UniProtKB/Swiss-Prot annotation:
Upper lineage: Bacteria, Bacillati, Actinomycetota, Actinomycetes, Mycobacteriales
Pfam families for this protein: Ala_racemase_N
Name the UniProt record assigns to this protein: Pyridoxal phosphate homeostasis protein
Native source species: Mycobacterium tuberculosis (strain ATCC 25618 / H37Rv)
Transmembrane segments: none
Gene Ontology CC terms: cytoplasm
Keyword RNA-binding: no
GO MF annotations in UniProt: pyridoxal phosphate binding
Functional summary from the UniProt entry: Pyridoxal 5'-phosphate (PLP)-binding protein, which is involved in PLP homeostasis.
The UniProt record lists the keyword Zinc: no
Entry-annotated residues carrying N6-(pyridoxal phosphate)lysine: K47
Keywords recorded for this protein, A-Z: Pyridoxal phosphate
Similarity section: Belongs to the pyridoxal phosphate-binding protein YggS/PROSC family.
C-alpha cells in the first residue's frame, strides 16, 4: 500500500481479523436460517471512524459503508479520494455510501450529492424533499442514478426514534407508494430497529411480517435493513438482507463528528 496507508499496519491487521470473524458469523447465521449468505449485505458503519479505516476496508473488499452525519461523510469522502489515489486503489466513487442516520429535510440537497442509499426515510415531506434534490442533482450531473430508499418503520408507534408508524393502517403503504411513484427515488424495501424494551425475536418477526405485506404490493421492494452487532443472528432469521455493524467490526469509536 502507498505511504498514507502503510503507516497503519496494526489497524489493517485488526480490521482484517475482525472482518473475517464478522463474515464467518454472518455465514453461520445464514446457515442456521437456511439462507444463502450471498443475499445478505454486511454494512460497516464507519461514523466516527477515520477515512483510513474506510480505505482499509475498501482494500479488504468492502464496497459499502454507512454514515450518519452529512458533514462528516462529505469530509471523509474527500480524504478517502486522496488515500485511495495515493494507494492506487481508485477513488471514492467505488464506495457505495449509505446514510443510516435520521435525515433532516434541509440537508436533502447535500445528501443528494453523496449518498447512494438512505435507510431512514420516514415522512411524506422528506420523500418530497429528497426527490426534488435528487432530480436536481441528476440534471446537474452531480449524480448518475436515483437514490435508493429504505422506508423506516416504527414498530411501536414511538416517533421519537424515527420511522413510519406501522400501527396506523395505511401509513407505511402511503410512504412506499410515494417513493415508488417519485422520479428520483428507488424503493428498496423497509428498515427497522427493535424498540428498546422489546424482545428482538418478536420485533424482527413483526418487521418481517410488515415487509412481506409491503412486498405483496411492491414486488421490487425486496430489501430489509435490519440487525446490528448484538442481534444480527435474529435479524437474519427473520429475513434481513442488510445488517449494519459498527463497534463489533471496527471497535470503539475513534473520532468526534464535526
Amino acid at each position: 500500500m502507498a505511504a498514507d496507508l502503510s503507516a497503519y499496519p496494526d489497524r489493517e491487521s485488526e480490521l482484517t481479523h475482525a472482518l473475517a470473524a464478522m463474515r464467518s458469523r454472518l455465514a453461520a447465521a445464514a446457515e442456521a436460517a437456511g439462507r444463502n449468505v450471498g443475499e445478505i449485505e454486511l454494512l460497516p458503519i464507519t461514523k466516527f471512524f477515520p477515512a483510513t479505516d474506510v480505505a482499509i476496508l475498501f482494500r479488504l473488499g468492502c464496497r459499502s459503508v454507512g454514515e450518519s452525519r452529512e458533514q462528516e461523510a462529505s469530509a471523509k469522502m474527500a480524504e478517502l479520494n486522496r488515500l485511495l489515489a495515493a494507494a492506487e486503489l481508485g477513488h471514492s466513487g467505488g464506495v457505495h455510501w449509505h446514510m443510516v442516520g435520521r435525515i433532516q429535510r434541509n440537508k436533502a440537497g447535500s445528501l443528494a450529492r453523496w449518498a447512494h442509499t438512505a435507510h431512514s426515510v420516514d415522512s411524506s415531506r422528506l420523500v418530497t424533499a429528497l426527490d426534488r434534490a435528487v432530480v436536481a442533482a441528476l440534471a446537474e450531473h452531480r449524480r448518475g442514478e436515483r437514490l435508493r430508499v429504505y422506508v423506516q418503520v416504527s414498530l411501536d408507534g414511538d416517533g421519537s426514534r424515527g420511522g413510519v408508524d406501522s400501527t396506523t393502517p395505511g401509513a407505511v403503504d402511503r410512504i412506499c407508494a410515494q417513493v415508488q411513484e417519485s422520479e428520483g427515488l428507488e424503493l428498496v424495501g423497509l428498515m427497522g430497529i427493535p424498540p428498546l424494551d422489546w424482545d428482538p425475536d418478536e420485533a424482527f418477526d413483526r418487521l418481517q411480517s410488515e415487509h412481506n405485506r409491503v412486498r405483496a404490493m411492491f414486488p421490487h421492494a425486496i430489501g430489509l435493513s435490519a440487525g446490528m452487532s448484538n442481534d444480527l443472528e435474529v435479524a437474519v432469521k427473520h429475513g434481513s438482507t442488510c445488517v449494519r455493524v459498527g463497534t463489533a467490526l471496527l471497535g470503539p469509536r475513534r473520532l468526534r463528528s464535526p
